[in-house]
Amino acid sequence: MAPMIPPRLQRFPATASADEIFAAFQEDGCVVIEGFISPEQVARFSQEVDPAMEKIPVEVTNNGNSNDRTKRFSKCVIASPTFRNEIIESDLMHELCDRVFSKPGEGMGYHFNDNMVIEVQPGAPAQRLHRDQELYPWWNSMGPAGPECVINFFCAVTPFTEENGATRLVPGSHLWPEFTQINERDCPQFGKIETVPAIMQPGDCYLMSGKVIHGAGHNATTTDRRRALALAIIRRELRPMQAFSLSVPMKLAREMSERSQTMFGFRSSVQHCDVDMVHFWGNDGKDIAHHLGLEAPSVHV
């Protein structure tokens, strides 16, 4: 049987230390960070992606598909200057990513998997419960002791309420002894899982382990379009969902910080192995940035 689930979400202001937030993340697998994005940034970002979101049709499938009455948009870095110049430059985000993925002397241990606006429309059904690490199917076989494969900074762009489909989280599920497919009837917890809604104001986010069971809630309203920004980050050894370095114009890439260029695949991540320096996503043993004509990095990231 699974251990008792704490019926709460720990919450911290964005001014809290990364160590405090990370300790709660380790304990529960998910934690709310209040004010992760400023109100001004949220307003500008939402306005900048509005034109693209309006062009996306609303699908009504009624078949359990995760796109049922849910819009998704993954070109935030192109559509939003606020996103690429401010939101992804959060030092707190990178401090937490370092604690999850990076090791001393091994450089930047992570990059973006996806950046997605997710807008749950009125009447959208609840999403099936799942773990994000199931994107990489073998990861569940390692159980709770396995390394983190993916984390998500899931940011509220509009208010998250229980009525409009706030994400349902299962704190503590990252420590369950068995990581079986939770929607299968042979799962010991099938039909018995207690979820907690992530109630948030615009600018708040929850940081979630890829091991945590969760799913979007049912939007029972007739008017609310529950909009979120998902910043999904994976360990550098894994292939991302989005081919950013092939789809983002070089003009925009040149304007990014070295850190963001690495996050999107315009720079290699460097690992020191014994006496060698290994480039992940490199070119002929060198940093891919040289091939792309970018300036040499001031430090190895």
Swiss-Prot record:
Known outcome of mutating V150L = Completely loses its original activity, and instead catalyzes the AusE-type 'spiro-lactone formation' to yield preaustinoid A3 as a single product
Please give the annotated consequence of changing A232S: Completely loses its original activity, and instead catalyzes the AusE-type 'spiro-lactone formation' to yield preaustinoid A3 as a single product
Q: Which InterPro entries match?
A: Phytyl_CoA_dOase-like
- GO terms, molecular function: dioxygenase activity; metal ion binding
This protein's record includes keyword Metal-binding: yes
Record has Nucleotide-binding as a keyword: no
Which residues does Fe cation bind? Answer: H130, D132, H214
Q: Which cofactor does it need?
A: Fe cation
Per its UniProt record, what Pfam families does this chain match? PhyH
GO BP term (any one): paraherquonin biosynthetic process
What PANTHER family is this protein classified in?
MULTIFUNCTIONAL DIOXYGENASE AUSE (PTHR20883:SF19), PHYTANOYL-COA DIOXYGENASE DOMAIN CONTAINING 1 (PTHR20883)
Record's family? Answer: Belongs to the PhyH family.
What does this chain do? Multifunctional dioxygenase; part of the gene cluster that mediates the biosynthesis of paraherquonin, a meroterpenoid with a unique, highly congested hexacyclic molecular architecture. The first step of the pathway is the synthesis of 3,5-dimethylorsellinic acid (DMOA) by the polyketide synthase prhL.
Domain text from the record?
Answer: Residues at positions 150 and 232 are important for type of reaction catalyzed, using identical substrate. Both ausE and prhA accept preaustinoid A1 as a substrate to form divergent products through dynamic skeletal rearrangement.
What is the protein's given name?
Multifunctional dioxygenase prhA
- Provide the species name: Penicillium brasilianum
